[in-house]
Amino acid sequence: MKRKSFLPLVVLAFAACGLKNLCADDFAAVTAPVGRVGAALITPVNQLVTPAGAQLELPGGRPQALALSADGKLLVTAGITHELVAVDPATGKILQHVPLPSGKTLEPVPAVDAILDADEKAQMSYAGLKFSPDGTRLYLANVSGDVKVFSVAKDKTFSPLFSIAVPPVNLAKRTNDLPTGIAVAADGKKIYVALNLSNRLLEIEAATGKILRTWNVGVAPLEVLLAGHKIYVSNWGGRRPVAGSVTGPAGQGTRARVDARSIASEGSVSVIDLAAGQVSAMTKEIVIGPHAGALALSPNGRWLVAASAGSDLLSVVDTRSDEVVETFTARQNPGDLFGAQPVALAFDAAGKILFCANGSQNAVAVFQFAPRETKLLGLIPAGWFPCALAFEAHTKKICVANLKGLGAQTEKAKLDAPGFGFNTHQHAGSLSFIALPSKGELKTMTATALANLRYPLLAQAKLPPRPDRAPVPVPERAGEPSVFKHVIYILKENRTYDQILGDVTTGNGDPTLCNFGERVTPNQHKLVREFALLDNTYCSGLLSADGHNWADSAIATDYVERGFAGWARSYPCGGFGENGRDALAYSPAGFIWDNALAHGKTVHDFGEFTTSEKHWKNPTVKTKITFAEVWKDFAGGENAIAHTAEPDIETLRPFIETDWSSWDLDVPDVWRAAKFIQRLKAYEQQDNLPALTIFWLPNDHTSGTKAGSPKPAAQVADNDLAFGQIVEAVSHSTFWKDTCIFAIEDDPQNGWDHVSAFRTTAYVISPFTRRNAVIGTQYNQTSLLRTVELMLGLPPMNQFDATATPMFDCFTNPPDFTAFNAVTNNVPLDEMNPAAKKIKNAQLRQDALASARLPLAQPDQCDENVLNHILWRATMGAQPYPAWAVKLVDDD
């Protein structure tokens, strides 16, 4: 049943009223779907986005940075679209799209050569976009390992000139360094470039690309700022480790200082005196909070402000002494939970107003700047995750780059078109142009921004437990009793609601997008009939790198949000081994297991954030272990293959299942289910099922149509049967009476959905779950985490789970203890993809060849657009690929 969307009037009213008349009850349960309604966006992270000012949408963009020319007449941005976008800040109109110059030459070449040989793989790095002081040059840090140089003509048109290579690095998976922040000398003759992987700063002759000097700085330098004869460099990971430092992996084999949870513990600002000749050491290093990033210099050059996105703090440095003289918070109140994530700074022309982009709050904080007495004046609503700022003094406009703009859904008007749907790869960043507000206007904007964040719920989330409360499925306050003693939290891989449950007539599904319906997934269909069907639940992330972070920590850090620029340091979702382990990626507020352990709860992890390998127990056997070998070993009970897992986050080591397979699509999920059921029996014998069990069940990702792997339908059927077997085992165990099972996808990127790119399948299974119910309340991954926290007596970790809607509507009391019985699969689990040469259909044969080349050994390394086309054709036959999703792809 396909339902049209509507937005409750109360939600839109939040944007037009003050907070004084709002209480937490006004935010209780939203039933609207995620997506755009007019100029507003309902996000899958509990927030409403209603940006102030004029908006310029950048389809496919994710703009990472802004550069404003000295005369204020040109604004430039860049993101993941392999180009510059030049804009007139006065009108908000695009002036020019500029290709990035070739990276093949290190010397200046005629502009025409650079244009004809444009670098179509280059894209904006984490940071680094600067005009020369005279406005005739523009420099862009390219994530692939060079600096792109552009000329700017008198008529304000750009031309790509040449690229400046930076020295290589010798890392396990990368030889190109990663340029980030850029500063340009006052005379334009030198540029200063931070190298994010080698932890260095380069001084480069602008005309020739010659490296003049090199300095060591801190870990993962991001921004560079020139102040007189000194250079300031912000370092995401703080000081370089020394002997005795407690360290953890920080991507690409690098290390950073960490805390007891293996999460990055500090940031820093390196100070370099340019007048010190050839000395390569920094002059000083100022330690601030983790994820040090944005820098801004007051117009008089006296005060440097540095933002720590990992602590929500801003530090004011006196450039005469290089001492911190003030630290203040970007949050509305200092006692608020983590979650502002200040990621960009800008001063007004007089230096009396400081603007700060609070990425996680979709707002620009406005401060009255007075060192030692800085005061928050209010918040201006921006787009989704503002990450760059510029203040245009002539028109008094605040220019904001919004990383996620107004969401992935750029074609909402086509909702009723046949076969219409959304996919998370429909990126859409934006720029906002906001007139400097008056005092009264700022007050109204502040009320809007806080209402958009459901801010009153932060206070409610911190209320103490009340005495003498009877146990309920989901307590209203952390610490109040729950009927549940155990939670099992299962993460699956990459499916949308419509792909699996689009054929369920009682829910809001589109059967034309359902390629793994009841024939393939009979257990999931039986579960939603016997328990509850959730048809308005969403993943919070786009893909595995941010998806697993949202699913486990209820937030994605600034580091992860910027990482979409090529994932140059790591792909931090687990399953990658050393090169995916990255303490800089993780939330300073920790993961759900950190929360549980800190409050005395027992935890066990079956695969999440672990990396595994398999080998023959008999070392003389040299046969390659394929799916066929694993299936034979499992189905035949041979037990000749050993599986071992290592934690990707060191603090998980005592709590992981070591005889385990995490991400390995050659290992069937029914193997994982069987191993878990063995462990469950041991738990029963010892009566010690952990309070929190985390489980990664990944095979619904599929291997495409790769020969030697099961067909897509077989792998999804395998995942379905394993899920059903786990539920069956738990529901027939002694723990059933006080156990709740949650299951959700990590992200929905490998599919299509007619409601939202983020909508997914979710399951709430327990004796207290409402039976035979359709739940239309809007939930997301943070809702699941908030509900888990309330069940286990845990406080929220950050502002996102604190303001999430608990899943009260999914439960009832008294309970129904009827157990679940799994049903057998309809699709053989070992139904294999044929060899390409045996496929008669030319397109399907091409798909098989393409699948063979997809890098499926680790999560999300293949082109998802190609894989989605392959899955569609493999499962939907001759039905045309959805028109909304068509784009030119190279299926070869």
Residue locations for each model-derived region?
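Generic N-terminal leader/processing signal
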Residues: 2, 18-19, 233, 620, ...
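A short, polar/charged loop/turn motif at coil->beta-strand junctions and beta-hairpin connectors
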Residues: 8, 48-52, 158, 280, ...
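Intrinsically disordered low-complexity regions specifically enriched for long asparagine
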Residues: 5-6, 23, 625-626
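Predominantly soluble domains enriched in secretory-pathway, periplasmic, or organellar proteins
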Residues: 23-472
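N-terminal pro-sequences and low-complexity stem/linker regions of secreted or lumenal proteins
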Residues: 446-892
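Bacterial N-terminal signal peptides
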Residues: 8-21
